[in-house]
Amino acid sequence: EGWTTNDTHQHTSEKGLTTLVKVTNHITITTRANRAMVRPPATSSNAEEHVSADGILGSIKSTLDGISGTYIICSRAGNGLHLYSRNKFGVTTPEKTLMSITTSEVNTIADLPSTCRHGYVVRVVNSEENQDDYFLKFKVVGIADEITQFGTYTRSAQVITITIANHGLQNEDQIILDCTEGGGDNSIYNVINRTDDTFQVQGDTSGTISTPQQCNVTPVRIGEGVWEEVVEPGKPIEIDNTTMPIALTRVLPGTFSINGGSNTSYPNGAFRFSYPDWGKRDCGDDITNPEPSFIGQTIQKMVFFRNRICLLSAENVILSRPNDFYNFWNKTAMAISNAD
C-alpha cells in the first residue's frame, strides 16, 4: 500500500543476495465496503399500536446518526430521508415495494419524490437508449433558482472559516461547501460561530490553510417543490458571441458619442454595433441537445426564412427557433417541439 510508479526497494536475502526492485507501473483499486446496516426497531403485531412513517424514518435517522465513521449526513425530507457524503456511496433495501431509492438516475418521473433538496439533479433514463434521456432539477417552492454564494475560506485544524459579506446564514443552518481552491473538504456542514460576514464549520480531517482560498457555499433547503428540466451538469451552455455575426441597428437622428469621442450630431441617423445574445442551452446533453454544428466552423451565409434565421455552415443549414432569432438550442429534450 502506498507504492507509486518509480518507487524502489532494496532487499537483502538471508544468503546475502541484494536485489533492487523498482515499480514500473501502478493502478489504484477501489473496493466496496458496508458503511452501515440500518433498520428500524421491529413493530408490534398488535393492531392497537400506531405505526407511522414519521416514527420509522425518525428511527432510521437516529440509528444512522448514532453510527460513527459513516461520514453520511442524514436529513429529513418529507416522507423520506436525504443522505449526503463527500465520498461515493450506495444505498440498497430488501423492501423495494416499501422504500424507493433515488440517486443520480431514475427510470421514470414517477420515481421522483415531491419533497427533496433544492438544486438536486437527476437523469431520467427512460430506456437503455441515450437518445431519450433528459435531466431534471428540483426547485423548492418559494426559493430563488440560484442561491449559491461565492466567498473565501481559511482552515485551522478541523475548523474552516468562511468569509461572505452579508451571507444571511444562522447557526445550525446546513450548507454545501465546494472548495474550488485549496485543500478544503467538500461536504455538507452545520454553521457555527456566525457573524454578519463570516461563519465557521467543523470537518472530520485536519489541516492548515492560511491564505484565503475560493469557495462556493449553497444553503441546504429541503421542502416541497417541482422538478424542472435542465441541462446536464458540467456541459457548456453558451455560445461565444465574439465569434458570431454582429448586429448593426440603425438608430434615429441625434447626438452620439462614438467610441468615447466627443458628442457629434448625426442628422441622418447612425448604426449601433452590438453582440447579439445567442441564447443558452437549458436542457438535454450532447446527444439530445448538441451544440449547433456551426461551432468551430465558418458561417458562410445568413438568410431569413419563416421567422427563423438560417445559417449556412459547411454542408449544413442550421435554423434558429421561430421568433427567437438568435437561439439555436432545442427547447426541450423530452420531446420534439414545434420550436425545434
Segments the model singles out, each with a brief description of its role:
Residues 276-307, 312-340:
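Beta-propeller and closely related beta-pinwheel folds
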Residues 1-8, 25, 29-35, 39-41, ...:
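Acidic/polar, low-complexity linker and loop regions
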Residues 36, 54-76, 115-127, 134-141, ...:
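Ser/Thr/Gly-rich low-complexity blocks that favor extended beta-strand/coil architectures
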Residues 19-20, 301:
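Conserved beta-strand position repeated once per blade in WD40 beta-propeller domains
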